[in-house]
């Protein structure tokens, strides 16, 4: 299909497609405030009078915007089927609600006669002009149920090749888009966009030089499988969600830049239970109000033509990051809705010098398990929340600065740290626990494998089962500033020095340690607040 000299479209109208399918919106509308909370994952909704509804009817249902939030910030906007009249004031719908709705929020129901089972297949489409008026695109669906698209291969379309809004149960498969006229105009240059959609599958699609391959906006229970976007250097990211309270989405086996829930506060920058598996890209950002994000086998490879940092960023709100690889990794926090921990396990990161690993706003606990960090030079863990590193391997760059840690509670349990170290920022009261056979080796620019800055915070040190080996110019532990409570039992120090300034120690217990060729540069005398006997000095 070619569309030269096609009739001009109207302003901002992505539904002005060559093939446009639109259901009928009736005049039947009901609005009512909720008398009680509508819980998450329910399919039973209160209504003023269930007699107004019939089983098998289709209705749009939406909640009023969040009070004090963005203009379009709504947790619920879906096209749903009435599946049962429960009682005089409740109906059951074909959708399990993704977000709790508080009492007092207003729901609006509108009856719709949707387009049903209209399919478009096997089309080669060439777009027309370069703007919203002269451009063209193949197909749009609005208020549609069970309408599938397959085998559309488009070039140069302005609006999305497949545009959907208020759609339920659909497939978009084996479609492609190359070289739209713009990737800078919002809403244009997409292969497919879904707004207020349910139960969709996008599969086996490809794009080149587009804004988005797939955009899911205020949608739920959808999958995106085996889709691949290249030419994503010039302003487009193939995979995105709008951040309008999307939930329960799966991305599996795709490639291309990914940016989740990041269209702006107007829509809420929120999403929940998004899972990304076996994904390859050079930039992956998910640092807005994304709750219970799951990443498995995501590989981010730095590319000189786009993000040379190879960035992967997540929100510390129930994120589970497993088996992932990136150059730059950062944990942010914009929300605190989850009940599950934020855990990063079996991952590999090659951190840039001075990079912030845990950002300032992070107050949630963050747990790194069996992770490998290379090229570390002054990486910063700035947030106040607890940080735990279990069996991690951290390798510093040449003449590297130690990790700078602001966490109020840092636990290092096992693992190996080579040519790096820990310096507590002491911007607040802090506790550091080193246990589980941690091995520290090498040296760093600060001249201390474990130390603290001269901040105002009180630091509590608990070192047990540590093995530390270094040269004569480097301290295993250096405590020279502030107020400190120090405990070291059952540790092995080889070479190096111990620098424990008495005036900086409110209490000290250093016992049952092996000091093999280690010089005590400073050490408190035994007394009521200090005990240093019972060590093996070799």
Each language-model region and where it sits:
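All-beta strand scaffolds that present successive hydrophobic residues in beta-strands
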Residues: 1-2, 119-121, 147-151, 170-174, ...
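Short aromatic-glycine motifs in intrinsically disordered, low-complexity regions
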Residues: 66-74, 106-111, 381, 403-404, ...
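Autoprocessing Asn-cyclization modules and mimics
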Residues: 4-94, 100
């Amino acid at each position: 299909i070619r569309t030269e000299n096609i009739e001009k479209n109207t302003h901002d109208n992505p539904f002005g497609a060559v093939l446009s399918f639109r259901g009928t919106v009736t005049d039947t509308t009901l609005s009512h405030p909720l008398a009680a909370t509508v819980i998450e994952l329910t399919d039973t909704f209160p209504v003023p009078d269930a007699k107004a509804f019939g089983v098998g009817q289709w209705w749009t249902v939406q909640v009023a915007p969040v009070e004090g939030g963005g203009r379009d910030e709504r947790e619920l906007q879906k096209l749903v089927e009435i599946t049962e009249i429960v009682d005089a004031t409740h109906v059951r719908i074909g959708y399990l609600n993704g977000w709790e709705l508080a009492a007092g929020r207003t729901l609006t129901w509108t009856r719709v006669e949707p387009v049903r089972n209209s399919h478009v297949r096997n089309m080669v489409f060439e777009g027309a002009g370069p703007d919203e008026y002269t451009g063209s695109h193949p197909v749009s669906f609005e208020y549609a149920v069970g309408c599938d698209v397959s085998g559309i291969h488009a070039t140069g379309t302005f609006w999305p090749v497949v545009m959907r809004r208020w759609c339920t149960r659909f497939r978009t498969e084996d479609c492609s888009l190359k070289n739209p006229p713009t990737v800078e105009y919002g809403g244009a240059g997409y292969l497919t966009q879904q707004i207020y959609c349910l139960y969709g599958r996008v599969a086996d699609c490809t794009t080149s030089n587009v804004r988005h391959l797939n955009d899911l906006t205020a949608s739920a229970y959808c999958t995106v499988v085996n889709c691949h976007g290249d030419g994503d250097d010039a302003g487009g990211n193939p995979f995105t969600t709008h951040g309008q309270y999307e939930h329960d989405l799966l991305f599996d086996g795709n490639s291309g830049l990914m940016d989740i829930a990041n269209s702006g506060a107007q829509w809420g920058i929120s999403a929940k239970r998004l899972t990304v598996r076996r994904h390859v890209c050079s930039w992956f950002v998910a640092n807005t109000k994304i709750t219970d994000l799951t990443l498995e086998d995501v590989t981010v490879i730095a590319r000189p033509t786009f993000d040379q940092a190879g960035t992967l960023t997540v929100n510390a709100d129930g994120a589970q990051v497993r088996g992932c690889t990136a150059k730059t990794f950062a944990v942010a926090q914009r929300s605190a809705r989850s009940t599950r921990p934020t855990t990063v396990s079996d991952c590999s990161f090659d951190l840039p010098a001075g990079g912030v690993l845990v950002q300032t706003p992070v107050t949630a606990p963050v747990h790194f398990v069996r992770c490998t960090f290379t090229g570390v030079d002054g990486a910063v863990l700035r947030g106040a929340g607890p940080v735990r590193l279990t069996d991690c391997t951290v390798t510093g760059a040449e003449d590297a600065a130690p990790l700078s840690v602001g966490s109020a509670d840092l636990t290092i349990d096992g693992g190996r740290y080579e040519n790096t170290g820990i310096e507590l920022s002491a911007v607040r009261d802090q506790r550091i626990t080193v246990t589980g056979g941690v091995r520290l080796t090498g040296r760093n620019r600060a001249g201390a494998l474990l130390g603290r800055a001269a901040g105002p915070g009180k630091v509590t040190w608990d070192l047990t089962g540590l093995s530390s080996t270094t040269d004569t110019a480097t301290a295993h532990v250096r405590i020279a500033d502030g107020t400190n409570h120090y405990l070291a039992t059952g540790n092995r120090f080889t070479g190096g020095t111990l620098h424990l300034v008495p005036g900086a120690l409110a209490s000290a217990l250093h016992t049952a340690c092996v000091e093999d060729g280690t010089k005590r540069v400073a050490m408190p005398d035994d007394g009521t607040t200090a005990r240093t006997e019972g060590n093996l000095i070799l």
